[in-house]
């Protein structure tokens, strides 16, 4: 089953991928408030779907691949977790490789996967990781950039 971006899914009349149906999300760029709001919406949707899941927040600036592996692994308290990774653009190579490997695994077996929601500020820093994760099956949620007055009205 091909994973479509949210824009492609809407154009084809398909439902928008959600935290309940897709284990790996990338919230990319745009207005910082809307970016944060998109992450919160995905997190709340995942918490409604999996009320017993533990929510873990990581900052890619100082998190390593061991912390990510531990966050997505089952714990004594719950079988799955909801992992929020902020500042994805600052992830080191080893963390990026670990995330890509987990994304491939999670997309192939979503019923047992933890939910991962990554937040990227946009720009070219970390673009290679975004491309690798998208290719591995992550759903990219591109956030609107409100630089023009017309965009702010909507």
Task: List PLM regions with ranges.
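Non-catalytic interfacial helical region
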Residues: 2-15, 19-25, 30-154
